[in-house]
UniProtKB/Swiss-Prot annotation:
PANTHER family noted in UniProt: 30S/40S RIBOSOMAL PROTEIN S3, SMALL RIBOSOMAL SUBUNIT PROTEIN US3C
Domain of life, per lineage: Eukaryota
Keywords: Chloroplast, Plastid, Ribonucleoprotein, Ribosomal protein, RNA-binding, rRNA-binding
Family label: Belongs to the universal ribosomal protein uS3 family.
Designated name of the protein: Small ribosomal subunit protein uS3c
Gene3D superfamilies: 3.30.300.20, Ribosomal protein S3, C-terminal domain
Organism listed in the record: Pyropia yezoensis (Susabi-nori)
Gene (UniProt): rps3
C-alpha cells in the first residue's frame, strides 16, 4: 500500500504537516480551498524560474500569511524588494480585500535535498533533449551529495523518442515507502518534449524520525512528542 498512496499524504500528522493551515465552516471551505489553489497556481506561473520547493498558506481571521520556500530568493524578492511588492499586489487581487496579506520568503540552503527541485532539474534537462539516463544519473549524484540516505527516480513515456512508451526507474540507497516514521519527500512533474509528455517522479529518503527524537518535533511543528502520538 505504501507504494500506491501519495507518500506525503500518507504521513500527514506523523512526519509531514499540512501545506495549508486554517479552519472554515462548510459554507466557506470550498471558497477558501479554491483560493488556495489560485494562489499556488499564480505563484508558480509568475515565478516559474525561482526554484520554488513549497508554498505554505496560513489563515487567521483577518490575515493571510503565505510562506514561499525557494532556492533562489533573489528572483522572488527582486531589486530592492520590488519583486515581492509586485507579487503582493497581484495576490491581493485574488484575496478578499478586507484581509491583510503577508508574504514571507525562506531560502533553501540545500536545493538538491528537495524532491521538487530535483524533479524540476530532470524535467528541464529532458526538455533540452538531454538523454533521460544522463539526466537521471546527474540527479541521483546531486541528491547523494546532499546527504540523502536514499533516492528513487522514475521516468515514464516515449523515452528518447521510442515508438512504444515505457517506464524506467533508478534507486540508490534505501527508500522505505511503507515505514511511516521514514522522512520521505516526493514530487512528480511533467516534461513536455517534441515526442510527447514524459512523467517524472522523485522520492528522497532523508532518514527515520523516531517519536522520542526532537527531529519529529521540528518536522511536524509541534511542541511536545506526546501531542504527535495522540
Amino acid at each position: 500500500m505504501g507504494q500506491k498512496i501519495h507518500p506525503l499524504g500518507f504521513r500527514i500528522g506523523i512526519t509531514q504537516k499540512h501545506r495549508s493551515s486554517w479552519f472554515a465552516n462548510s459554507k466557506d471551505y470550498p471558497v477558501l480551498l479554491q483560493e488556495d489553489h489560485k494562489i499556488r497556481s499564480f505563484i508558480h506561473s509568475k515565478l516559474s524560474n525561482a526554484s520554488i520547493a513549497k508554498i505554505e498558506i496560513n489563515r487567521k481571521v483577518d490575515q493571510v500569511e503565505i510562506l514561499i520556500a525557494t532556492a533562489r530568493p533573489g528572483i522572488v524578492l527582486g531589486k530592492s524588494g520590488a519583486g515581492i511588492e509586485s507579487l503582493r499586489k497581484s495576490l491581493s487581487l485574488i484575496l478578499d480585500p478586507s484581509k491583510q496579506l503577508r508574504v514571507n520568503v525562506v531560502e533553501i540552503a540545500d536545493p538538491d535535498s528537495e524532491a521538487t527541485l530535483v524533479a524540476e532539474f530532470i524535467t528541464q534537462q529532458l526538455e533540452k533533449r538531454v538523454a533521460f539516463r544522463r539526466a537521471v544519473r546527474q540527479a541521483v549524484q546531486r541528491a547523494q551529495r546532499a546527504n540523502t540516505q536514499g533516492v528513487k527516480i522514475q521516468v515514464s513515456g516515449r523515452l528518447n523518442g521510442a515508438e512504444i512508451a515505457r517506464s524506467e526507474w533508478v534507486r540508490e540507497g534505501r527508500v522505505p515507502l511503507q515505514t511511516l516514521r521514514a522522512d520521505i519527500d516526493y514530487c512528480h512533474r511533467q516534461a513536455h518534449t517534441t515526442y510527447g509528455v514524459l512523467g517524472v517522479k522523485v522520492w528522497l529518503f532523508k532518514g527515520e524520525i523516531l517519536p522520542e527524537s526532537k527531529s519529529l518535533e521540528s518536522a511536524y511543528n509541534q511542541e511536545t512528542p506526546d501531542s504527535t502520538a495522540s
